[in-house]
Amino acid sequence: MNYFTQKKYQTFFFVLIFGSLCLNAQMRTYQSGNFTFKVPEAYLRERKDIPSFWISTVEDVTEFLYRNVKKGEIEIIGHSAGGRPIRAVVYGNARQGKGTSTFSGSLGFRDVKAYRGRNHDMTVYWGMAGVHGFELEGIVGIVNLISVIETGKDLRGKAWPEISEQAAKIDRLILIPIVNQDGRARLPLRMGKNYGSDNTVHEYLNTGGNPDGTIIGWPQIKEFIPLDFGKPGFPGGYPNDAGVNIQHDDFFGKRQPETQALFDFAALERPDLIMNMHTGAVYMTMHRPFCEPVLSAVFDSLYMYVQKRLTIENLQGTTKPENINPQRAPRDAYNIDTALNLHCGALSVVVESPSHTFDNKISGGALALHTPDMLLDAQLICHREAMRFLVETGGRSKWTPSPNR
């Protein structure tokens, strides 16, 4: 059975289960994997006019990849806790061979080339999204980025020549549209409705909710890892099918298969820059990672590239680029970006997008409005400027040059 025939049967089976309603007319019961969940009926209403460029579900993203990726290659880099394949799209040539030391050893030797090997000067860009299942903006962004690399245009037909130009100058591109396949599969929506300033539905679907429809909330969702799926309530899209939020996995203990897949692929590819796309900001915002101190100044420069351009494009809360200051960037705690940095030496950065389902209030009570087109523009501008940064600064080999040369 080929992929597309299999998809038809899977979709039919899912629709039958998803369509069954429980006795309470305000709750809907559906199954994802081996788990059955009840969610308020109203929370599962989709936007009526979903744009054609908004490709975000596991099924639709997978179909898009197999229909459209011609210049790159699709690789299955691992499987989720629920057994779902994690797909990456890669362009260019991978690093060859290995170094002579561990990453930690190379830091002790004061020459990262000892870890990265003879292709140390290569530049490798890694973009990933969907670490949390209902943070759709980054998924849509990477799908459209793949479209640009393949055709020169996003799925709206808009050309991005500078993305094509920068991508051609990078030795290796790695794009992972959905990291947390389980969390995304748990949410049957392609695109939620917009609820104005009310973020209840987004938080319920993303960070989870209680049986009465109230939200667990952030950061409360991080108090219990793993979550017990046997308890009443809905876990949201944060955890995988083992109940683990892989953004905060047990990195030095028993790692989840998604985390291990990222670790193994990162050790193989040894990227310079990882852009970890999330949702949870008033305006698109880059977070300062908890990482090697030597990369702090590198982050400052990356921040200015991205945030300044977003400001110029009127996608920030200010129209004055001179107001952009990396010292005001939110500071992340120890998380998967820290672990990836200390695992392979990459500068790994969280970027938070606004949500399509609600608009945050800003000063004076006004709403920071973001249309789907604006959200996509911000995603692609972020990737474009991050790529430009990598091209113009030269990557890890130039950020921390070897004193042994």
Report each predicted region and the residues it spans:
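Hydrophobic h-region of N-terminal signal peptides that target proteins for export
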Residues: 15-24
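Soluble metallo-hydrolase cores and metallopeptidase-like ectodomains found primarily
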Residues: 59-122
